Amino acid sequence: MSQWNSAEWADLCSGAACPICRQGKPDGIVLELATSYLTSSINAPMRGYCCVVLKRHAVELHELSDEEAVAFTRDVQRVSRAIHELTRPVKLNYEIHGNTIPHLHMHLYPRHRGDPFEGRAIDPKLIKVSPYQVNEFANFVAELRARMSAG
């Protein structure tokens, strides 16, 4: 039986077994926003990576009310602006999957010349080492918080 046909998958989608809902908040919170949490990780697949995680449980964007969808998109826009200002990427990728954890969240990947996936899709499983040097991640988080608080 595939994962998507299992009772476990149904429990994840309903929120009953959602790991984010069960612990109350996602890991790696940088900042609490209007409808979401801004998260990141020292073990991110690339420098400047962030994830915007909806506070309440929903699996799909269409499950949000119009007001929630606008507010979530506004949160993502604010985060993307701050990431762009901090990292000056060639391109900023936005990804919503939910295949592993069906709780609405959007990954933001700043893309740079020479990044490990230049010109192709990102595969986080291929990254085995943190992209950050000592103190670099803490500095990124502090700068990101400052930019988000200012704007």
Question: Where do the model's predicted regions map?
Answer:
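HIT superfamily nucleotide-processing domains
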Residues: 1-151
